[in-house]
Amino acid sequence: MSQTLSFVLKTHSVRKDFVHSVKRTLARRRDLQYLNNKLSRSMRAEACPSCASYDVCPNCTSGDIPDDGSSTMTIPSWEEITKTSTYSLLLSEDTSDELCPDDLVNVAAHIRKALSTQSHPANVEMCKEQLTSLLVMAEAMLPQRSRSMIPLHQQHQTARLEWREKFFSKPIDFLLERIGVSKDILQITAIWKIILEKACYCKSYGEEWFNIAKQKLREIKCFEGNTLKPLVGAFIDGLRLMTVDNPNPMAFLPKLIGLIKPLNLAMIIDNHENTTSGWIITLTAIMELYGITECTIDIITSLITTFYDKLAKATKFYSQVKALFMGFRSEDVANSFWYMAAAILCYLITGLIPNNGKFSKIKACLSGATTLVSGIIATQKLAAMFATWNSESIVNELSARTVAISELNNPTTTSDTDSVERLLELAKILHEEIKVHTLNPIMQSYNPILRNLMSTLDGVITSCNKRKAIARKRQVPVCYILTGPPGCGKTTAAQALAKKLSDQEPSVINLDVDHHDTYTGNEVCIIDEFDSSDKVDYANFVIGMVNSAPMVLNCDMLENKGKLFTSKYIIMTSNSETPVKPSSKRAGAFYRRVTIIDVTNPLVESHKRARPGTSVPRSCYKKNFSHLSLAKRGAECWCKEYVLDPKGLQHQTIKAPPPTFLNIDSLAQTMKQDFTLKNMAFEAEEGCSDHRYGFVCQQSEVETVRRLLNAIRVRLNATFTVCVGPEASNSVGCTAHVLTPDEPFNGKKFVVSRCNEASLSALEGNCVQSALGVCMSNKDLVHLCHFIRGKIVNDSVRLDELPANQHVVTVNSVFDLAWALRRHLSLTGQFQAIRAAYDVLTVPDKIPAMLRHWMDQTSFSDEHVVTQFVTPGGIVILESCGGARIWALGHNVIRAGGVTATPTGGCVRLMGLSAQTMPWCEIFRELFSLLAKIWSSVKVSTLVLTALGMYASRFRPKSEAKGKTKSKIGPYRGRGVALTDDEYDEWKEHNASRKLDLSVEDFLMLRHRAALGADDADAVKFRSWWNSRSKLADDYEDVTVIGKGGVKHERIRTSTLKAVDRGYDVSFAEESGPGTKFHKNAIGSVTDVCGEHKGYCVHMGHGVYASVAHVVKGDSFFLGERIFDLKTNGEFCCFRSTKILPSAAPFFSGKPTRDPWGSPVATEWKAKAYTTTSGKIVGCFATTSTETHPGDCGLPYIDDNGRVTGLHTGSGGPKTPSAKLVVPYVHIDMRTKAVTAQKYDVTKPDISYKGLICKQLDEIRIIPKGTRLHVSPAHTEDYEECSHQPASLGSGDPRCPKSLTAIVVDSLKPYCEKVEGPPHDILHRVQKMLIDHLSGFVPMNISSETSMLSAFHKLNHDTSCGPYLGGRKKDHMTNGEPDKTLLDLLSSKWKLATQGISLPHEYTIGLKDELRPVEKVAEGKRRMIWGCDVGVATVCAAAFKAVSDAITANHQYGPVQVGINMDSPSVEALYQRIKSAAKVYAVDYSKWDSTQSPRVSAASIDILRYFSDRSPIVDSAANTLKSPPVAIFNGVAVKVTSGLPSGMPLTSVINSLNHCLYVGCAIMQSLEARNIPVTWNLFSSFDVMTYGDDGVYMFPTMFASISDQIFGNLSAYGLKPTRVDKSIGAIEPIDPDSVVFLKRTITRTPQGIRGLLDRSSIIRQFYYIKGENSDDWKTPPKTIDPTSRGQQLWNACLYASQHGSEFYNKVYRLAVRAVEYEELHFEPPTYSSALEHYNSQFNGVEARSDQINMSDGTALHCDVFEV
């Protein structure tokens, strides 16, 4: 094997003549074979690109036609070949001897056959798969330019290209899966190239490619015993601990108990709950028990990351198991046991199932294993073989990745800078990964190969760095040209100037040579006589040098290709005063970049004039260059006298400024300043400002400060380097710069206030502050003194340089190592330490080597920590602070020395002087450091107290027994009591009918008490049951039942039991149940596996049901289907089912007011622990009058809005049936996706907007501005005589500068105040009365609308579409039908409504455009418009429009007057009702909408629901209208707590019902306050007419006598009752002959009973007219619709005719004037004509097309404005 390996790897070093000889010989012989037809063509049925490289291709199952050889003659055997001198010379380095051509042909034939077939002897030690891997390995170790010499290189490259074409478009998951399962190294290499190529171009393919590439490069598909060795090691350690270390187990037991603390642990586990808070409490208690709270808080992030790593490895397990069953080949093995043991051992060591190619070697090794001893020996041999295979697989994997990366290092593949940077990062990652394996002792034999791989990657990294440097912007150098006559000393001055600019030797460039391989890249570059040759384009060369763009030099040597010009200072010399002529095209660019110094030597010039022809003596030159005169020209001076013309025309027109004379020192300083200024403005110093500290002092103190800093460095054993000036040198850590005030510096500056060199002898405490007078924070000082740049490994150790030990750790186990390393690491580094510690388990003797590698890829914390590790392999000292330094000693030392002082910084004192010299950032950093210290001291206690608070306040209900034992057999006590057959039947029947579990003794005692006339509750109920049983004694029949259980004799009931019909005395006098269950359509039964009822559940919507835990415990079914996705939170739980009930109930966290049957609930609603027969249960105690029974658990308790707030879970039993235990509703997230879009997002934080608590929206909808109301052309001069004007227009309106937003906010604030309303019991009793009263003329079970479009067409299409769709409904209609946008919105809401799910109750807010009284305009009062969602309006119309129509159809007789026409005979019916009353009260209310109680509105909605068919549409509409409304305006959403939106569907009917309920409650409360029990229906005792907030109360004398208390109660409910005319004073009875209702005065006129419209309402119709929207309402509209305006004024005249001729004449004059000025086309009627027309319309003789018969109108034309 080693010989073949050497041959393959050394083929590339064979001489070229040998290669050519082999090729020529093979070609000649092949041609001869074809001519003689003795060599058949090599054929291979290939199915994939890699088939040619394998005996049995791992990718396909294609058959092979093997090649029989390449020689026409007989060739020597392989054994003979290996003995030839040619073969020996091939394996040696010496190839100078002549090689025999025939031997070379024979060797090539054998190698070719070994690579193409498996029948060759060379394959005995090495299969073809291994040969292919070796060739790929050879490719990886060689530079790319040398790989063409490797055998089959071109064939492998072609195969990889074809694989690339097949897999390039595949997703990343597919490629990673192929890498994990593929055994073809060519395919693996191609896949790696695809992944890395897309990672380099992640901008195009996605960042996930780059992230996954980095992650996978760090992972090697290997198996180094990480599974087997830790398990065996742990077993051995545990066995040693129990036997050798502690032979007495009994002595060890107390220690174990004391360590585990089982009692405390058991109590913690016993109180654990499977909830979020429960887990927090339990884990905190366990951490506190074992004292690991603090460290657990620090490493929780690492644990989460580890969990995800485990998940990522799940697919690998599947692949291995699949390969185990699919990859075996049948073998003839006699010793199957050892064969199986070998396969298992191979898997445990290598992590791979042995393939068929390796089975033969396993079989050969085990062929002699016939005894136990021989089997053990064979197993040992196999273990060594498997270890070698494992290492080979690792090297193959690394080789494939190296080849992929090296092939990507090509400008045609990675072309842009971003791809090069990413390729560089990937190459570094792979380089570090290979470096890891060089430290692995198992891989030591492969270190030469690994080093070659690293060398290849070093070449890639170097190439990428060069390519990056070419594209990177560089610092612009400074170029000075020394011009002057020859011999004046320019070149010598240039050399001296270079020494003053830099300590380095200057680089020299000669422009006469076209290549610059000699350029060294030093800071100073000298170009002597740069313009001496006319053949050189020196101008462009200089322009390229003095530029920020990289300049690539022309170099001939291969290793210098890509060399860049990097010098900072360029000094050039020239004999010409004008190096570039001003007329040149490049003159401007040239002179802008250079500075010219005119150099003259007066001594030399005077000598030449005085003694021409003689040599210049040395005395004319001085060492300090004082003999030279250096005159610096101005900018862009092309000669001494002139400056370049900016226009490039006349270059001798602009005079040059006078020169500046310098010496050699000032010239050097000027060049430094020019370089700093030139580059400071464009590019800040990169990456080092955080590690540079400047100490500013005076020039005379520089040396003293430098010595003080060096003393501080020695005193604190610091890592910083002291530098004088802003320039920094290489340093292990930070750099401390001693600066003068004028020097620029990029870093942190500190001003030295004092420096005393005497303090060098005693530097103690705060040495920096005491010695330098500098106030530095502790963080800055620790960073300055101990920061370590990068990771440094020190092999040579000096004890006096070692840092002081802070911690000394003896490493007995890997856990000691991991625990100590925790102090050095950041959060991400701690996870890396866990992985490193796990790896150390396998090689504990190599800890120094492992630490050396581990620190290369670990992130360390910023705290300074020094730890000494005492390991079996020696001493390791680790120092970390940002970076890390490590010292590894192969021997033990007593103490690692070092200075023990700890640096301390200055403390910021706000009242002291130290803070004056510190920037604000340092002061705030000191504050944050203080807060961090406080947090570090209280973080554990904070967590414990938080968990303790959760434990004290958490809700912990437990399951409750439901009155049955688990065997479903009651306790049969009292067996000694003898019962007759009738008594026994009576006892059984009593327990069955009343669902009790009484024993025989208890039953007999109860019957005895009832017979004696006891008045306790149980005796009374028994007597009631006995009477009912006696009446129904004949309703039973004896039957015989034949079933699966056999023949049984039973008694069955022949008639159905019916509830007792309760009269008014019971119904209206008190609240008692049971009655009909709430949310009946949303309640379902939960059964067991046998179908027996266990309890109830409530549908929440979308197949999610709520119940209690003990009902759904065990096997539970709903509608015959097993429930799933069960989630619990205490006793409250939720589950899913595919069976969906027709309706859903809304849930709310609050206090209930009704039990499941409608009875009132009295409760404090506080969760407490209660002792029951099943143990302690935590729930809320409640009291109701309804008796419950086992099996009622899960029924809902509701609040006044019908929302479920709790579920029934237990009762007090027969002794206290009124006591109930209720589980409050708690939120459980069961969402799978968003149900419907809504504006109000509860997950967003609350904000305060002008005093309103609201949610911010993503969309902003502004409040419409302007008005459509304009002054009529007839009244532009006298419009102020009208009592009304258009409402305030906002901040620009001089009548009231209040903005529209402020008006809306002020109007919404009352809606955000809580309104209690009437008492609960009073309200529900009055609700019953009103239902009973309405049921006399409103039918029951009115069907809801089932067609969505039919319901939509019942709406007013002139109104808003609501918050989800802009505009009005008619704007989204085509040919009378809704368009797609509107239809999609309606369909989405209708779909939810048909499932009984409530919809978002949201409105868009606007302001009503109307006429308002002048005084209200000045106050800025406007009425809000609530634009309801069109989807909600459609659903409500479908649910309640028919019920509403049934109520309004009887307005003449009922209390609700919605729908009445006040211009019809209906007013006469109202008049008759008013006249029949004893006392009449006309009442109006101020701010009616905002003072409505939600409980009263919910009661009114329940009244509508009562008369409906209870369909899911009805449930959805009712639950939606009961939910709190949300007002949307100006980009915010406000959820109001009270009030009734004016735009709510059916608002007039609901408002009228509210009005009736309020009045009824006030009357009942007033009567019962006077000890008058109300046992009758109040609405049968008095009459009331309501239309929204307008009301007329017709009280009998008894009610009138307490009217003050009635109106007082109304005020107590939150209402604001007032007189109709808004005058101040008590509400008193009015004259029945002039009642004002709906702005109409109902009175008798000569024509009969009429409703007279208010006169001011008629008159203002003539002053204002509707037109276009504008802010200028005083200007008449541009266009007037004569038809609409004429109809409006015609109606006004008709209404005015009812007030008499005098008033009509006034109106007539206004009408005539309006016709004249407005150019209308009608003639105002005379008084008699108007009177006749009105009476005709009143009596129905003449139809009115403009008549409004709607719930929100007042029987006026649509253009007649309301008050």
From Swiss-Prot:
Active site: 1110 (for 3clpro activity), 1131 (for 3clpro activity), 1193 (for 3clpro activity)
All copies of domain RdRp catalytic, residue ranges: 1478-1603
Modified residues (O-(5'-phospho-RNA)-tyrosine): 984
UniProt keyword terms in alphabetical order: ATP-binding, Covalent protein-RNA linkage, Hydrolase, Nucleotide-binding, Nucleotidyltransferase, Phosphoprotein, Protease, RNA-directed RNA polymerase, Thiol protease, Transferase, Viral RNA replication
InterPro entries: AAA+_ATPase, DNA/RNA_pol_sf, Helic/Pol/Pept_Calicivir-typ, Helicase_SF3_ssDNA/RNA_vir, Helicase_SF3_ssRNA_vir, P-loop_NTPase, Peptidase_C24, Peptidase_S1_PA
Coiled-coil portions: none
Organism per entry: Feline calicivirus
Domain (Peptidase C24): residue spans on this chain: 1073-1229
Protein name, UniProt field: Genome polyprotein
Pfam family of the protein (one): VPg
Site annotation Cleavage: residues: 46-47, 331-332, 685-686, 960-961, 1071-1072
Residues holding ATP: 484-491
Known partners and oligomeric status: Protein p32: Homodimer. Interacts with NTPase, protein p30 and protease-polymerase p76.
Domain of life: Viruses
Alphabetical GO biological process terms: DNA-templated transcription; proteolysis; viral RNA genome replication
Keyword set includes Nucleotide-binding: yes
Lineage: Viruses, Riboviria, Orthornavirae, Pisuviricota, Pisoniviricetes
